[in-house]
């Protein structure tokens, strides 16, 4: 089965073709980073308009790269939510229209399920069950995964997501958009343990997380300390250490609670080098293994949507004729794939 995947939940237009026998055949991606840089963040209306401009050319490109036409496609998967409603509707409208006009089945995919399953695009894949840490600009959650669609959200951020805290702290430091990767680059120049930031909610039972207070602590530290480059790097390093340690502590607690031996990390923040290194070291000590997608599949992309959609289409799950986007969509409400 060959599935065309369409991702338009935020500020990346991602298109891919995935074959259940041959794997990923093609993927094309357009990022709107330059468009939103002048505003210091994503402007929803501009994001929607840019998706409209880019989506059809990217579909043509992905099909051409795969050596196919739409007639060779067996199904279409598009991101249904969560995300920006205008952006979601662009992908949903195009995906549903193509499916209707070419008489193909279509499925709306949960964006975070796409991230969760992104490591399945690699050669070395995790076996169910496993623990998943999903960390991005909009979400931070720890999920018990028994199978596709069999998810239990064990813990999540009660305020800012980890990626959001990275971006906001970067902005406080005067770093350009996108701030998270720039803050991490600055942190690499810092001296570890120069400052001690709190590890929020790690002294309390449970698996929920909080990062808004950490952002406030960073703001106060930035205001009180010298503004030279090394001090800025040390502060960035301390902030990153605190976020990574908090995530690692919560994951270790969840692994002990569930008895799972393998950990998946996915979402934009999963590309963070310090986070990967810390969790790999932790899992080695626990006798388990950590899995994550390659860098280009950590951020939003069509490949993960094509893969996730294929699993559901093969199970006979299809959308009706309605075009619908879900800005909010709890992950643990998804229908299981038997």
Curated annotation (Swiss-Prot):
Fe cation binds at residues 111, 115, 300. Keywords: Acyltransferase, Cytoplasm, Iron, Metal-binding, Transferase, tRNA processing. InterPro entries: ATPase_NBD (IPR043129), Gcp-like_dom (IPR000905), KAE1/TsaD (IPR017861), Peptidase_M22_CS (IPR017860), TsaD (IPR022450). The keyword Metal-binding applies. It is found in: Cytoplasm. GO terms for molecular function: iron ion binding; N(6)-L-threonylcarbamoyladenine synthase activity. Its cofactor is Fe(2+). It catalyses: L-threonylcarbamoyladenylate + adenosine(37) in tRNA = N(6)-L-threonylcarbamoyladenosine(37) in tRNA + AMP + H(+). One of its GO terms (biological process) is tRNA threonylcarbamoyladenosine modification. One of its GO terms (cellular component) is cytoplasm. Its EC number is 2.3.1.234. Gene3D superfamilies: 3.30.420.40. Substrate binds at residues 134-138, 167, 180, 272. Binds 1 Fe(2+) ion per subunit. Belongs to the KAE1 / TsaD family. Required for the formation of a threonylcarbamoyl group on adenosine at position 37 (t(6)A37) in tRNAs that read codons beginning with adenine. Is involved in the transfer of the threonylcarbamoyl moiety of threonylcarbamoyl-AMP (TC-AMP) to the N6 group of A37, together with TsaE and TsaB. TsaD likely plays a direct catalytic role in this reaction. This is tRNA N6-adenosine threonylcarbamoyltransferase. The gene is tsaD.
């Amino acid at each position: 089965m060959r599935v065309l995947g369409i991702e338009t939940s935020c500020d990346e237009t991602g298109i891919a073709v995935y074959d259940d026998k041959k794997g990923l055949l093609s993927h094309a991606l357009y990022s709107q980073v330059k468009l939103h840089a002048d505003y210091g963040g994503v402007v929803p209306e501009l994001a929607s308009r840019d998706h409209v401009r880019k989506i059809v050319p990217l579909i043509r490109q992905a099909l051409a790269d795969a050596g196919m036409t739409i007639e060779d496609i067996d199904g279409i998967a598009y991101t249904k939510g969560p995300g920006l409603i205008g952006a979601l509707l662009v992908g949903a409208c195009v995906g549903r229209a193509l499916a209707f006009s070419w008489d193909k089945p279509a499925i709306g995919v949960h964006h975070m399920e796409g991230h969760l399953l992104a490591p399945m695009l690699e050669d070395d894949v995790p076996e169910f069950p496993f623990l998943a840490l999903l960390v991005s600009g909009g979400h931070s959650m720890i999920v018990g995964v028994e199978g596709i669609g069999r998810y239990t959200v064990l813990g999540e951020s009660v305020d800012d997501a980890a990626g959001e805290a990275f971006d906001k702290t970067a902005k406080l430091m005067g770093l350009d958009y996108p701030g998270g990767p720039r803050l991490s680059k600055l942190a690499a120049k810092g001296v570890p343990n120069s400052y001690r930031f709190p590890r929020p909610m790690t002294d309390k039972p449970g698996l929920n997380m909080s990062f808004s207070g950490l952002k406030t602590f960073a703001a106060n530290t930035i205001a009180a300390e010298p503004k030279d480059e090394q001090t800025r790097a040390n502060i960035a390093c301390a902030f990153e250490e605190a976020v990574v340690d908090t995530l690692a502590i919560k994951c270790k607690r969840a692994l002990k609670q569930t008895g799972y031996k393998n950990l998946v990390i996915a979402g934009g923040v999963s590309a963070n080098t310090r986070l990967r290194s810390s969790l790999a070291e932790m899992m080695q000590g626990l006798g388990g293994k950590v899995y994550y997608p390659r860098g280009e599949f950590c951020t939003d992309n069509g490949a993960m949507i094509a893969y996730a959609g294929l699993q559901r289409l093969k199970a006979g799950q299809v959308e009706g004729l309605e075009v619908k986007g879900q800005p909010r969509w709890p992950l643990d409400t998804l229908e299981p794939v038997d």
